[in-house]
């Protein structure tokens, strides 16, 4: 039962007198999806040159992703010049402070860089990758004003372990990613306080039976949560299913979406880099063909996991409760009394039917919530 912006009750039995009750048939009601790794969507991206520009872009991005079931997200910046990152973090903080109750929550910032391995840059601009700096961390923390949620770092870089320790002490979730780290170096990062891995399998050494690398280190450590880009492109569906089976309570479905999400094929930007969308695949426009984010949305991520053989409840958890826990969003990711009324309604085939944020309908293209059969309170059997 939804009462204003919160869920007031969950369970079976007759409704209270005066309650509006909807018969949704065989449709599924689930917590709203939470995306920890999203760079853009609907034609806008997170990185920007003015605080207000960034704030407006982040809010527009969140509203686009709400049309695909995302009710909260962590706005993710790519590596950039120091002053641009500081501006971007300030803009994300401004977006996070917006109070529109019908707008998806911006939970804070995820910095994917700049302290990454140049050899594993992927679609990060190599020009902006640099050595870890405590001074830069301090400036970013000050700019974020308590909204810096995650930082991705390559733990083998000089000074990385000190950054991990300082950031964790400040309440930031430190994530291993874009790295050449071996198994032991990854475990050392975990010992220093890192508790997350950015897009497992991508931009890191693969899993090998004699060189297990960061993939095995993460899956073997029950303290560690792992992101999976569940588009069937970044990771083969069989490997998605394997990772989910290995860490069903620790896997996090993410989109890694860029500005092109929701748009037609063509050329777009990821930070300063030119990228090309063709079909569902985004790659750097230059000849390497390196994957450059995605046009994935969270509703499709859940459906992709289920199609790969992941149990529905496990797939939903990876898009809701687990990312909520990583982001410290205790009122989100669950259907329980007192939780935020962030809800998605899915068709039996998992197509999104409606999105509710804070008790307000923000997406209902088929007018389901207007047309669903009403059951008069007290008359349901």
Regions found by a protein language model. Name each.
Residues 1-31:
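Histidine-rich, glycine-flanked metal-binding segment
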Residues 334-381:
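C-terminal cap of metal-dependent C-N hydrolases
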Residues 213-226, 232, 244-339, 343-346:
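His/Asp/Glu-enriched, well-ordered alpha-helical/loop segment
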Residues 138-265, 284:
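Active-site core of metal-dependent hydrolases
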Residues 62-147:
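Divalent-metal coordination cores built from histidine and acidic residues
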Residues 37, 65, 111, 167, ...:
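Conserved, mostly hydrophobic/aromatic
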Residues 31-35, 106-115, 151-152, 194-201, ...:
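Non-cysteine beta-strand/loop elements that form the S-adenosyl-L-methionine
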Residues 27-84:
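Metal-associated gating/positioning segment near the N- to mid-region
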């Amino acid at each position: 039962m939804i009462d204003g912006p919160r869920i007031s009750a969950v369970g079976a039995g007759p409704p209270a007198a005066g309650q509006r009750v909807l018969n949704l048939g065989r449709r599924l009601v689930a917590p709203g999806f939470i995306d920890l790794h999203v760079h853009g969507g609907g034609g806008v991206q997170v990185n920007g040159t003015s605080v207000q520009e960034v704030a407006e872009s982040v809010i527009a991005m969140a509203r686009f992703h709400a049309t695909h079931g995302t009710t909260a997200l962590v706005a993710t910046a790519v590596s950039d010049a120091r002053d641009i990152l500081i501006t971007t973090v300030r803009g994300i903080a401004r977006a996070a402070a917006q109070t529109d109750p019908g707008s998806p929550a911006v939970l804070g910032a995820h910095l994917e860089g700049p302290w990454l391995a140049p050899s594993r840059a992927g679609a990060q601009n190599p020009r902006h990758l640099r050595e870890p700096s405590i001074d830069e961390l301090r400036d970013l923390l000050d700019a974020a004003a308590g909204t810096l949620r995650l930082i991705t770092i390559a733990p083998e870089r000089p000074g990385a372990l000190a950054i991990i320790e300082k950031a964790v002490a400040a309440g930031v979730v430190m994530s291993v990613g874009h790295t050449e780290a071996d198994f032991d170096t990854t475990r050392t990062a975990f010992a220093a306080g890192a508790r997350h891995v950015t897009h497992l399998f991508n931009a890191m050494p693969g899993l090998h039976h004699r060189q297990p690398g960061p993939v095995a280190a993460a899956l073997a450590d029950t303290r560690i949560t792992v992101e999976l880009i569940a588009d069937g492109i970044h990771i083969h569906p069989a490997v998605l299913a394997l990772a989910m089976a290995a860490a069903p309570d620790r896997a996090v479905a993410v989109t890694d979406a860029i500005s092109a999400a929701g748009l037609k094929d063509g050329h777009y930007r990821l930070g300063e880099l030119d990228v090309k969308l063709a079909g569902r695949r985004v790659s750097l426009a230059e000849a390497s063909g390196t994957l450059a984010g995605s046009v994935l949305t969270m509703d499709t991520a859940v459906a992709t996991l289920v199609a790969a053989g992941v149990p529905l409840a496990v797939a939903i958890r990876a898009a809701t409760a687990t990312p909520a826990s990583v982001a410290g969003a205790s009122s989100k990711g669950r259907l329980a009394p007192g939780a935020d009324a962030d809800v998605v309604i899915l068709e039996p085939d998992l197509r999104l039917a409606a999105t509710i944020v804070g008790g307000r309908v923000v997406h209902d293209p088929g007018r389901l919530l207007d047309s669903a059969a009403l059951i008069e309170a007290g008359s349901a059997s």
